[in-house]
């Protein structure tokens, strides 16, 4: 069996970042494979999230905070200076497009094809060709043309998604996995340092999955048997990383 990774954000900022990262991965998958009309679901979810919340200021503050921390690490002897330089350059480049005032994806609202689809996609079974003949026409286009269209649509969100990817990479890099045991299916941890993310890696052969709850200084992990859908009373070996 394979090892599965479960992540639990411990603050709203990381929760939002993970949702955006999840949609970004779906976008990239749709860019590489022809998933027909399913490619529009993550695109429209991203449109809705961007309209609901302007992440720009939060991301800019996070970039500045990490740049300051990375600059301090550069002065240390035992660190990978080349890797730090790569992150500093990447964050600096990612910061520039965020200075523009337009909301991410706002130009897609002017796209009549995209707007017509968004109005219908929330309705059950509303992708029939008599409801959306323009979609039926677009789906019949050669894959290369659809890929080009899709690439142009998701490009509107790259100024947001690129720094999100970098910031989550930096967050995950703050901790390594350590061996842990959930006795009777339960594990509790605490930290004097404010945590942002709990990561659990567990072998699927255990037949269970973790439910994680907590806040920045304390968290709890309950393992649930999938088949019975109840709390496991067995001791579960797993790997744990607590990221600040």
From Swiss-Prot:
The keyword rRNA processing does not apply. One of its GO terms (cellular component) is cytoplasm. One of its GO terms (biological process) is FtsZ-dependent cytokinesis. Coiled coil: none annotated. Keywords: Cell cycle, Cell division, Cytoplasm, Septation. It holds the Pfam family ZapD. It is found in: Cytoplasm. Its main location: cytoplasm. Gene3D superfamilies: YacF-like, YacF-like domains. InterPro entries: ZapD, ZapD_C, ZapD_sf. Belongs to the ZapD family. Interacts with FtsZ. Cell division factor that enhances FtsZ-ring assembly. Directly interacts with FtsZ and promotes bundling of FtsZ protofilaments, with a reduction in FtsZ GTPase activity. This is Cell division protein ZapD. It comes from Shewanella baltica (strain OS223). The lineage of its organism: Bacteria, Pseudomonadati, Pseudomonadota, Gammaproteobacteria, Alteromonadales.
């Amino acid at each position: 069996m394979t090892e599965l990774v479960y992540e639990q954000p411990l603050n709203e900022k990381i929760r939002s970042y993970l949702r955006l990262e999840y949609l970004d991965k779906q976008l990239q998958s749709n860019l590489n494979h022809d998933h027909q009309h399913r490619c529009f679901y993550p695109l429209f979810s991203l449109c809705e999230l961007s309209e609901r919340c302007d992440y720009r200021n939060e991301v800019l503050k996070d970039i500045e905070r990490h740049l300051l921390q990375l600059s301090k690490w550069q002065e240390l002897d035992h660190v990978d200076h080349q890797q730090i330089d790569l992150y500093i350059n990447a964050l600096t480049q990612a910061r520039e497009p965020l200075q523009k005032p337009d909301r991410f994806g706002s130009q897609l609202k002017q796209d009549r094809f995209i707007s017509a689809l968004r109005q219908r996609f929330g309705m059950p079974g509303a992708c029939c060709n008599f409801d959306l003949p323009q979609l039926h026409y677009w789906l019949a286009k050669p894959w290369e043309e659809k890929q080009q269209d899709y690439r142009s649509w998701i490009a509107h969100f790259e100024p947001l998604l690129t720094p999100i990817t970098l910031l989550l990479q930096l967050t995950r890099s703050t901790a390594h996995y350590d061996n842990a045991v959930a006795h009777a299916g339960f594990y509790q941890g605490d930290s004097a340092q404010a945590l942002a993310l709990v990561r659990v890696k567990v072998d699927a052969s255990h037949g269970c999955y973790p439910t994680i709850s907590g806040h920045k200084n304390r968290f709890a992990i309950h393992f649930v048997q999938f088949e019975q859908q109840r709390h496991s009373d067995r001791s579960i070996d797993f790997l744990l990383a607590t990221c600040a």
